[in-house]
UniProtKB/Swiss-Prot annotation:
May be proteolytically processed at the boundary between the N-terminal non-conserved and the central conserved domain in neuron-like cells. It is found in: Secreted. Belongs to the neurexophilin family. InterPro entries: Nxph (IPR010450), NXPH/NXPE (IPR026845). This is Neurexophilin-4.
Length: 77
C-alpha cells in the first residue's frame, strides 16, 4: 500500500584529539537519514534515523510520527 516518495542521507565526520590520549587523533561521525512514504489511505509516514559514533560512544535513534496526530479515527495498531 505504500511507496517511498523521498529519501535523503547526510553524513559528517570530524577529527579531534582523543579524550583518553590527547596526542592521538579520534573522530566523531554523524549520520542523519530521512524518508517519506506515500500510502494508499492516503497519508504520509515520515521516520528519521539518527546515529552518532565515536571511540567510546554510539547512539542510534529512530524517530517516527504520532499516528494519532490530527486524526478523526486514532490509530491503535
Amino acid at each position: 500500500n505504500c511507496h517511498v516518495e523521498y529519501e535523503k542521507t547526510n553524513r559528517a565526520r570530524k577529527h579531534r584529539p582523543c579524550l583518553y590520549d590527547p596526542s592521538q587523533v579520534c573522530f566523531t561521525e554523524h549520520t542523519q537519514s530521512q524518508a517519506a512514504w506515500l500510502c494508499a489511505k492516503p497519508y504520509k509516514v515520515i521516520c528519521i534515523f539518527v546515529s552518532f559514533l565515536s571511540f567510546d560512544y554510539k547512539l542510534v535513534q529512530k524517530v517516527c510520527p504520532d499516528y494519532n496526530f490530527q486524526s478523526e479515527h486514532p490509530y491503535f495498531g
